[in-house]
């Protein structure tokens, strides 16, 4: 876990990734001890539950993870499978429906799907 945490959280910019991408990067970076995909998923899940990662589900049902856990939106490029942050205040969401009975809206995050024009 420490090796994964160091890689994810000791960087200047936020990082968007899938579990499979992280597995390839981590295992290519250090040839000494390979980390299994199951360990990657378990570690991601632990970081998610602790509030250190955010999961973004794209329209192709692929889970990406984000080291930026503050409220913000995303562009998702369907051709490159890459996410790019959008400042939270750059999108105004109006006329939200009422939350189901007994529930309240906690947050609104928008993912805009893009492709080359």
Feature map (PLM): residue ranges:
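Positively charged, aromatic-enriched patches within helix-turn-helix-type DNA-binding elements
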Residues: 31-33, 65
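Non-DNA-binding regulatory cores of transcription-related proteins
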Residues: 50-117
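Short capping segments at the starts of secondary-structure elements
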Residues: 11-18
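DNA-recognition alpha helix
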Residues: 18-31
């Amino acid at each position: 876990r420490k090796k994964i945490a160091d890689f994810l959280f000791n960087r200047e910019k936020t990082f968007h990734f899938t579990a499979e991408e992280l597995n390839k990067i981590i295992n290519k970076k250090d040839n000494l001890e390979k980390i299994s995909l199951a360990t990657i998923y378990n570690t991601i899940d632990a970081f998610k539950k602790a509030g250190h990662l955010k999961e973004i589900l794209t329209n192709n049902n692929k889970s990406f993870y984000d080291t930026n856990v503050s409220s913000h939106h995303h562009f998702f490029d369907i051709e490159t499978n890459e996410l790019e942050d959008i400042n939270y205040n750059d999108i105004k969401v109006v006329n939200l429906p009422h939350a189901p009975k007994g529930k309240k809206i906690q947050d609104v995050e928008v993912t805009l799907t893009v492709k080359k024009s």
